[in-house]
Amino acid sequence: MRCPSLARLPNRALSGLTRSPVRLQSQNFLYQRCASTAALRSPIAGPAYQSVFHRHNLQRRNASAATTAAVLEAAASNPDGLSQEAIIDNLDPAEAIRLSRLRNIGIAAHIDSGKTTCTERVLFYTGRIKAIHEVRGRDNVGAKMDSMDLEREKGITIQSAATFCDWIKKGDDGKEEKYHINLIDTPGHIDFTIEVERALRVLDGAVMILCAVSGVQSQTITVDRQMRRYNVPRISFVNKMDRMGANPFKAVEQINTKLKIPAAAVQVPIGAEDEFEGVVDLIRMKSIYNDGPNGETVVVKDEIPEKVKSVVEERRRMLIETLADVDDEIAELFLEETEPTEQQLKAAIRRATIGLKFTPVFMGSALANKSVQPMLDGVIDYLPNPSEVENLALDRKRDEASVKLVPYNSQPFVGLAFKLEESNFGQLTYIRVYQGTLRKGANVFNARNNKKVKVPRIVRMHSNEMEEVSEIGAGEICAVFGVDCASGDTFTDGQLGYTMTSMFVPEPVISLSIKPKNSKDSANFSKAMARFQREDPTFRVSYNAESEETLISGMGELHLDIYIERMRREYRVDCVTGPPQVAYRETIGNRVEFDHLLKKQSGGPGEYARVVGWMEPTGKLEDNKFEEQIVGGSISEKFLFACEKGFNLACEKGPLIGHKVLGTKMVINDGATHMTDSSEMSFKNATQQAFRKAFMESNPSVLEPMMKIAVTAPGEFQGDVISLLNKRNATINDTETGVDEFTVYADCSLNGMFGFSTHLRAATQGKGEFTMEFSHYEKAQPQLQKELIQKYLKAQADRHKK
């Protein structure tokens, strides 16, 4: 074992990290040494030597406990001074081996890039499943990770699915080593982006899949942004090398230019399209082929085919040059004009990948069962194990100061619930264990509400199947039954006041009214609504008191359609829906000053509150701001708190069309109170009234959501597609033309995109596809604003007539 990196630990923690010579030797070695010495002695001396072993073992345990305690103190008191190397170096040897053989990875990509097909091959080659089945359920079985009937019918992944498998990798010395992989397959469609968000929040690494024909696509850019948000290292896999028009090096170039990540191929394909045979490994300089009915046999040859030798030499040179830009050791060798060894290249790629400076690019075809196993080797070689990733929590006992989580089983337990699912046995909660051990029957505490819950069952998930286990260690992913919580909740064993940041949840952009067709289905309807909200943070349910309608909101038409269909299938509730409604927003126009007095007297205690100040735009169409600039205490602290509450309530429902307010700032700098009639309610109401009056005097505007759109279709339909976008007042930003197809990138209002998929299919003979995601809010056209305001005023008038 290497010497612990004590120099990297803060001084205050060093006292507990004194190296013991016993710690450097394994228990087995000590036992063998004592036993072998005892064999030369008389039998009477045996117990004495046995006691020596126990004494050494006790010393080792005590030293290990002291080291662990010191690391924990350093993690809490000075997380910036505690390096991951120090955490790794001071791991218990058995723990170090376990974590070094563990990978938590996700597979993410643009829709239809082959994520689920690739995952199916991974499960087959690791022995997790016995036969390969295809997406869309064409063989009446369907891919293992698409367990929902809807997924198999539509050929898309709707929910992220977790599994685990073991990959046996041959080391450089020819020895086989078993690695444990926790794998999450994610959806590619933007409507289900929350599934990607919560998967990447808890994973240590990812495989980003690209199509060899299309390269970097719109959703690839979204996935890249999500990976950056959570600092997830990735390797890239250029899939579909057997497709017509495959050009893997275009994909490599686009990773560099579009995603702005230094990338280089670590493989060169042998042939392409229908002549794709295998790949050349640029690090080992060997050819790799697949043999057998399903490509299960990997054949490695020393000979590199003559037809690709020049490309191999050029791409290896480019790999070394790219690494020299991101890794100091390779840079030194490059300047010295020294050829790096295989081990030096691998180490550099690993360092740069984990450091988020580089992504190695692999190539293959999952559908053709070619070159998937080398990609799995890349997962092991270049993606981090849990001990190599920095994970932080907030200590609520110390004003939410940052603390570093240490993946030792011996530490107090900390875990994050990242996904909820309803099953036949109750709520299933997916948990990533960051620190300590989660045991069956143990009590854990929810950091959000400090509620104690018992863990009755722990399981490992394999898509929709499960295996029961008694405990889960640090760095692992599992699911538990019977734990009532929300997605994003932190659990601890009660010793620590830690909480972790949840995943990013985007705001819904589309709504529609919904009700059950038959009133007798109301109970099941309510049950379904409650479940779907609990499972999916981007699916919202609200009740509009004015129209007396239930509204569901989500990320797009497909998102809501899927839930309506699930309600029909899973709860046998047929629903009636209204037309889609856009999530408009309102914003202030100009700065407006206000001086508002609320004064009521009706026999009993009255109401009195005066608020003075101004409202103005914040400068960005984002969050609202409330400030108090009271001098002299004209309004007390508790009444100012009520003012802020009134401001926030007013922003929830704007005066213009009844939608949320954005980009508005309110400042209160004076006011007055009454000795007996002033109350928190008075100031809350006064602030709301002042807000509405000032807002309407400011020349306010209605904002509409703008969407980023990418439309891909065969080249002969380019004119029709652009005409279609122009009719919707879309702003075309860029056009890319490929061999057989083109892609148009545009911005368009969500209001203009309703029904677009139907018109696109008609214009392209069913061959076009598009993706869209929320971009930003901007002012709606004056005519649309006028129509929306008139509609709102009419609805208000009709309501008052009732």
From Swiss-Prot:
Residues the entry annotates as binding GTP: 109-116, 185-189, 239-242
CDD domains: EF-G, EFG_III, EFG_mtEFG1_IV, mtEFG1_II_like
Keyword Ribonucleoprotein: no
Any one GO BP annotation for this protein: mitochondrial translational elongation
SUPFAM superfamilies in the cross-refs: EF-G C-terminal domain-like (SSF54980), P-loop containing nucleoside triphosphate hydrolases (SSF52540), Ribosomal protein S5 domain 2-like (SSF54211), Translation proteins (SSF50447)
NCBIfam families: EF-G (TIGR00484), PRK12740.1-5 (NF009381), small_GTP (TIGR00231)
Family: Belongs to the TRAFAC class translation factor GTPase superfamily. Classic translation factor GTPase family. EF-G/EF-2 subfamily.
Protein name (database record): Elongation factor G, mitochondrial
